Swiss-Prot record:
Family, as annotated: Belongs to the peptidase M28 family.
Organism name: Kluyveromyces lactis (strain ATCC 8585 / CBS 2359 / DSM 70799 / NBRC 1267 / NRRL Y-1140 / WM37) (Yeast)
Intracellular or extracellular location(s): Vacuole membrane
Active site: E196 (proton acceptor)
Protein name: Vacuolar membrane protease
């Protein structure tokens, strides 16, 4: 009885397959939710950790009281508070030394690489006055290569910087507290750096420090979102990834798909890690990455994050740094020195519990082995099945059903993508799960209907094994392409590992099906091809049909039917012939009637979970970028379509066994998800549209000012801005790539026009100037209460400017830079708010061509102010930038504002010398 119950329960039938499918979906959903929320309940329970966390949380509240960009006065307050905390922590430790760049007058003029554009040929000069706070914790073994811990304490003008990068900064304070009481083996240098947001300058200036020579490794803490979990964005190589794996046992989180985004420049932004990497350090870039709708806005506050998120970053940095500098210095150094670990790493976590690392070079070797061994094995098994006569499917069945179903379903979701692009392209920024679920359910539904129709009209012996073989062949081609990409990219295509896993498990499932077929019931010697065995679409077994038995004395006569029916004698002949087989073979035949379950478990759950987790993390990071450009939108849609196909493909061999209830549910889910995706409002209070603000004052000829708002086209920005209380006259125009620029005359800032440019001398107008003699011009840029100005040259021709000299205020030091390649721009910073001007001397050489000489130098000067808080004018408290405050107060809740440039207000002056 139990045997019959077992057979009836676990046969390859619709109820069983449907139940297993539903269980797979439920388990993956539960694991995903658990993974996304587990960190919230993972706060420390020991006293020392709680003490560090509480202190860090208090520090975070203090430094995020106001926005604090480099161009703000409150930036100095944050610097002073951090310096006071650092000195308080380190005063009792004899092995700690503190250095303040601001007090030491650290400044530098240097040519700055364009880290956002590797192909740039511009000569960009930067003069930077630093206020970094450096702390050296001397190690017990100072001869060992040291570790740098880095985070930046500046914010953007519109953000309070709780996550970007307040949590990184206070995590460093907590780690400093720990290492002040527990001297490490390696030397640690802490870099609390300033002005990361607009040029990564705090990290750059540190590379000129003597303490930079002490370190070989870096842990950079960053915030590219507004909370949740801190991900391992990227790491230098397999050795550093292995150290993360060995050290971070509590809540590891990261995926090398993110790393490939940086390698390929798909991710256009950068962090301080890039500067350290370019200067020879190896290490880890650990960052918050979501939600981007709060990133660089007024919602990047303590109120919109949590202690749990702070603890996640602090705990990871603590575990990793302890392993490297204290607990396992010898073991870690052996791993770091191992040349076999020098290639880029492929890594990923499983539900923040297990972390897996493999060398990209090693994966390349494995791919080649799999590409060679698995197809040969499958071909040999196929030949064996032919020899044994157990393969009884016509050749015409090969590469027809699955390719046709994939074509129809792919065409359908491509049409859906185009429809969604037209009607609601930015719905992903509100909720990426439902649009993606729409793609998944639609793809599955179309394939189920098409393949079920095939099976009804043209049933075959073992559709699932045939389909798995076809999928294996298709996956082989994709793996070949990925392996080529892995090699041609210098092993930097670190996001291709899901294709390897997919091909491996699909091939194993195919292999199992062929092995089962080898032990299947063979046809009667007198009837080599008994089509009736597999012509019923509702068959419950894999290779044979359970049919009513004929009486044993039944014989074939002249009146027997020409085509056997289920009650004909030939149907019983395999059963009769099987009695002559050995008992072990008969047992295998009975057991392998349930081979479908092994094939399902090999092909579906592991692939589905790994692919879903990768896609979920990818959409989590990228879904809100649809607001930024058409390119980003196209990328998200591409990931959705290819991701849905990739995710659902392992299930296709089993879709013909999904019962009508599952099919109905798929249909309902498709309709509901489609309705939401096509018609729901893309922006809400919890998922607002981000607008980018700058107020530009032009004093080139007549003084005029405009507010410029950049945002996603098609979001009724003009209508919303026109309804502001000031009733501005708004004009909008396309700014390219799916965005628009809206301009209107806003309310004037309440700090006057604190910029004036005087041309003190210009030899271009000197009548005694010789024809081939260089020109000189002396400028004085008067800027009160300012820290940042940008000069751009050659705006009327080629690179004429060859030399620049300048002084900051009345200081005696002259800074000079000369290059025959020409200078494109000069970025000037000064820490003192009381220094009223820059004196700049420019030297340029006229260009002589057949058409004549070109000797005019164009100079564009922009100075930035980054504060929008209150000020006192004529005894009254007023807003510094009322145009911005009007937006904050009166924009609908579905909009949020970020900065467009380095300051909230830009004053512009153009000269021709």
């Amino acid at each position: 009885m139990m045997a019959n119950y077992f057979r009836s329960t676990f046969k390859f039938r619709k109820t069983t397959v449907s139940t297993l499918f539903v269980l797979t979906v439920l388990v993956i959903s539960i694991l995903t939710w658990f993974d996304a929320n587990k960190y919230k309940s993972n706060l420390p329970d020991d006293k020392s950790s709680n003490s560090l966390l509480d202190a860090a949380w208090h520090d975070l509240q203090v430094i995020t009281e106001k926005p604090h960009p480099y161009t703000s006065h409150f930036n100095d307050n944050v610097h002073d508070y951090l310096l006071q905390r650092v000195e308080q922590i380190s005063k009792k430790s004899k092995f700690i030394e503190v250095s303040d760049d601001s007090a030491n007058g650290v400044s530098k003029l240097f040519q700055h690489l364009d880290v956002f554009n590797d192909s740039s040929t511009e000569t960009r000069l930067v003069y930077y006055e630093s206020s970094n706070i450096l702390v050296k914790v001397e190690g017990k073994s100072p001869q060992l290569p040291g570790l740098l811990l880095s985070a930046h304490f500046d914010s953007v003008p519109t953000g309070y910087g709780a996550t970007d990068d307040g949590k990184g900064v206070v995590s460093l304070l907590a780690l400093l507290q720990y290492y002040s009481e527990n001297q490490p083996e390696r030397t640690i240098v802490f870099n609390f750096n300033n002005n990361e947001e607009f040029g990564l300058l705090g990290a750059t200036i540190f590379t000129y420090s003597e303490w930079f020579k002490l370190v070989s490794y870096v842990i950079n803490l960053e915030g590219a979102g507004a909370g949740s979990k801190a991900a391992l964005f990227r790491t230098s190589d397999t050795a550093t990834a292995l150290l993360y794996e060995k050290s971070v046992k509590d809540q590891p989180f990261g995926n090398s798909i993110y790393q490939q985004g940086f390698y390929s420049r798909f991710v256009s932004s950068e962090t301080d890690y890039k500067i350290y990497e370019l200067n020879g350090l190896r290490g880890w870039d650990i960052a918050f990455y979501k939600p981007r709708d709060m990133y660089h806005t007024g919602k990047d506050t303590v109120q919109h994050t949590s202690k749990a998120a702070l603890w996640h970053m602090l705990n990871i940095a603590w575990q990793l740094s302890k392993y490297v500098v204290a607990d396992q210095t010898t073991a870690s150094q052996e791993i770091l020195d191992d040349e076999s670990n020098s290639s880029p790493a492929i890594y990923f976590d499983i539900i923040s519990k297990w972390f897996f690392v493999v060398s990209a070079r090693q994966l390349y070797v494995w791919n080649i082995v799999l590409l060679c061994v698995l197809p040969i094995t499958l071909i040999l098994l196929r030949i064996v099945c032919n020899k044994l006569g157990t393969w009884r499917m016509p050749t015409s069945a090969l590469f027809t059903r699955i390719p046709f179903a994939l074509f129809v379903s792919s065409f359908t979701i491509y049409f859906t993508k185009e429809l969604l692009l037209q009607l609601n392209p930015t719905i992903w920024s509100r909720n990426f799960i439902l649009p993606f679920l729409f793609c998944i359910s639609e793809f599955l539904l179309i394939n189920t209907l098409v393949l079920a129709l095939f099976e009804y009209l043209w049933p075959i012996q073992d559709f699932k094994t045939l389909s798995l073989l076809e999928l294996s062949a298709i996956a082989w081609l994709f793996l070949l392409k990925c392996t080529w990409d892995l090699s041609s990219s210098g092993f930097k295509a670190t996001g291709v590992y899901p294709v390897t896993v997919f091909y491996l498990f699909i091939s194993l499932a195919s292999m199992f099906g062929l092995c089962s077929m080898c032990f299947g019931k063979r046809p009667n010697a007198t009837n080599d091809y008994d089509n009736s065995e597999f012509m019923r679409p509702d068959t419950n077994d894999t290779h044979s049909i359970e049919c009513p038995r004929q009486p044993e004395d039944s014989e074939t006569t002249e009146t027997s039917p020409l085509i056997n029916t289920p009650s004909s004698s030939v149907q019983s002949s395999p059963i009769a012939s099987s009695k002559s087989l050995p008992g072990a073979v008969q047992y295998l035949q009975r057991t392998l009637n349930y081979d479908w379950s092994a094939q399902y478990l090999l092909a579906v759950p592991i692939n589905a979970f790994l692919i879903w987790e990768s896609l979920f993390n990818l959409f989590d990071a990228l879904s809100m970028t649809v607001q930024e450009s058409n390119k980003a939108t196209e990328a998200v849609f591409k990931f959705a379509i290819y991701g849905a196909i990739f995710l659902c493909s392992p299930l296709l061999p089993f879709t013909t066994k999904l019962n009508r209830f599952v099919v109905i549910i798929l249909g309902v889910v498709t309709i509901l998800a489609a309705s939401f995706s096509l018609f729901a409002a893309p922006y809400t209070e919890l998922a607002p549209l981000k607008l980018r603000f700058v107020q530009r004052i032009d004093i080139s000829r007549e003084t005029k000012q405009n507010v410029e708002i950049y945002g996603r086209a098609g979001a009724n920005i003009q209508e919303v801005l026109s309804s502001l209380p000031s009733r501005p006259n708004v004009s909008c125009k396309d700014s390219g790539s799916g965005t628009e620029l809206c301009v209107y005359e806003g309310m004037w800032p309440n700090f006057g026009i604190p910029m004036k440019v005087d041309v003190v001398k210009n030899t271009h107008n000197d009548k005694e100037h010789f024809e081939y003699e260089p020109y000189f011009a002396d400028l004085r840029i008067n800027v009160a209460d300012n820290r940042l100005c940008l000069m751009k040259f050659n705006t009327t021709g080629k690179k004429h400017l060859k030399q620049v000299e300048f002084k900051v205020g009345n200081e005696t030091t002259t800074h000079s830079y000369r290059t025959d390649e020409g200078i494109d721009s000069l970025l000037l910073h000064k820490l003192s708010w009381n220094v009223p001007y820059y004196d700049v001397q420019l030297k340029w050489i006229p260009q002589y061509t057949a058409e004549g000489s070109s000797d005019t130098l164009g100079v564009s000067i922009d100075c930035y102010w980054g504060e929008f808080d209150e000020t006192i004018v004529n005894g009254q408290v007023v807003q510094k930038i009322p145009a911005y405050n009007e937006l904050l107060q009166f924009l609908p809740e579905t909009f949020i504002v970020s900065n467009r440039e380095s300051g909230m207000v830009t004053i512009h002056k153009y000269l021709e010398l």
